[in-house]
Amino acid sequence: MEILPVGEESLGVRSMCLYVETRDVRILFDAGVSLAPRRFGLPPHPRELERARSVRGEIVRLAQQADIITVSHYHRDHFTPWYPSVYMATDGETYKKVYGGKKVLMKSPADLNWSQRRRHYGLAKALQEAGAKAVYADGGEWRIGGTVIRASPPLWHGPAGSKTGRVIAFAVSDGEERLVFVPDVEGPVEPEPVAFLEEVKPTVVVVGGPPTYLGWELERALQRLTEIIDIGPHTLVLAHHLLRDLAWREKIEAVLQRAEKRGVRVATYAGLLGRKDELLEAMRRDLYAAEPAAAQPAEEGIDEGD
């Protein structure tokens, strides 16, 4: 199994895009990228805008190779929109380059909030225009040669009852490795993501960690991460919300110690690529201080919760 990180906070953008290739199938998980419209009262620095364009180019390139593309939920950093956006590095045709003719395993709208349901409607229409085959994936399973792809039931995007709605996780097994992609569970804080992992018994876990930068109470998230380590993967990739905090390692020190004791490698997307973390969003204030730049006009319709 080949695992290639594409975009994520350690690579300078908001994303969890990941490319996975087995002997039988090529999958691009969550083909999206975006930037926080405001952080520390500042809009994206030009270096962030440049990085978003770079990641978008890689998403388009890998999408054209992929057989399957996923949409775990309808936040803008997890799918390619059908309209132009500076913060998502799209024009009006980008979605066709990403989704055109592809099989898209996507979150069902059945239990979505109004905001995500509206985005689902727009994306579903765009997928039809692009000639994609959209499949609601919640709880489903697909066998392609010797590879099995499995989707979880809906999981909370953070604590139960969260206004940010629900997501789905994906597991890929090729008979040697078992990877589970668990986006935006914000820890996790609820037991259901851990239960899904216990069923799959993954060798590699890619999980959206807790948003420590928002001042969260961490105890439940740290406990869940410890439970994931105890399942016994050889690699735990911590991603997304957690890496919007420059001090994230210090705040999860107990988890890192547990992983070391159990022989579990803890990595970031950048680390998997052999690169240093570049937490550009968390560095935004410092970037403006070191490299002063005129603030770009705010992009309408984009909010912090996306």
Curated annotation (Swiss-Prot):
SUPFAM superfamilies per record: Metallo-hydrolase/oxidoreductase
Stored PANTHER family: UPF0173 METAL-DEPENDENT HYDROLASE MJ1163-RELATED, UPF0282 PROTEIN MJ1629
Organism: Pyrobaculum arsenaticum (strain DSM 13514 / JCM 11321 / PZ6)
Pfam family, one: Lactamase_B_3
Name of this protein: UPF0282 protein Pars_1056
Family: Belongs to the UPF0282 family.
Highest rank taxon of the organism: Archaea
Entry-linked Gene3D superfamilies: Ribonuclease Z/Hydroxyacylglutathione hydrolase-like
